[in-house]
């Protein structure tokens, strides 16, 4: 039944990719459930995905980063709940940078221990998708079909440093850690979009993506169910790790639907450094 959901998301990717080329990117006079100003394209993509996913017979409910509450289907005995961010990084569209859709498939309830598959779609010069179950499989659309490019695997140590959050709000220990990576020769690669930045680390073999607790966002900014848990699942299946600085991401509890957390994703070497600094 998972394959039904993945196939539906593949179909959705083609439609969303088309919408991105034709739909207005102007801001609306509305704010989503996470407190972000909405673009017209955010609303259109969210509406499309919600209708598409709620019609799947194996889906009991869905929840979107754009919506306040869980939305239930008529299939009350179905096993799966899908949490998704319909268009992560949509503010980057005007700059013509890559953006994406993030999804997590949960069995029966919304908790990290019930996450059984996850992934993301990246809309850029190429249309690509990563799906994690037993492995993190990488797909690319070639204009006629989706081609399986194989499993992604992180090296033990990488070369990319993608530090999120406003620097003036960082803790001193975090600033020192980021500077130590640059001193080792790590390259700055940060667009402000979670999908392209984490995707680049996976494609290039390793590194560190960080979005720490800051003075203006002590609980972090990124949402557990829609963004952090799905990417943590992908990274672990690719041989990496994800932590909030103290605990493994996929061991965290969820206080509410839009609960957020500090987060660090990367190769084993970078994760060891994070543990040394934060634990």
Curated annotation (Swiss-Prot):
GO cellular component, one term: cytosol
Residue positions binding Mg(2+) 1: 65, 85, 87
Subunit structure: Homotetramer.
Cofactor requirement: Mg(2+)
Pathway recorded for this protein: Carbohydrate biosynthesis; gluconeogenesis
GO biological process: fructose 1,6-bisphosphate metabolic process; fructose 6-phosphate metabolic process; fructose metabolic process; gluconeogenesis; sucrose biosynthetic process
Residues where Mg(2+) 2 binds: 85, 88, 227
Main localization of the protein described in the UniProt heading: cytoplasm
Species per Swiss-Prot/TrEMBL record: Helicobacter hepaticus (strain ATCC 51449 / 3B1)
Protein name as annotated: Fructose-1,6-bisphosphatase class 1
Protein's cellular compartments: Cytoplasm
Substrates-to-products reaction catalysed: beta-D-fructose 1,6-bisphosphate + H2O = beta-D-fructose 6-phosphate + phosphate
Family, similarity comment: Belongs to the FBPase class 1 family.
Domain of life where this protein originates: Bacteria
One GO MF term: magnesium ion binding
This protein's UniProt keywords: Carbohydrate metabolism, Cytoplasm, Hydrolase, Magnesium, Metal-binding
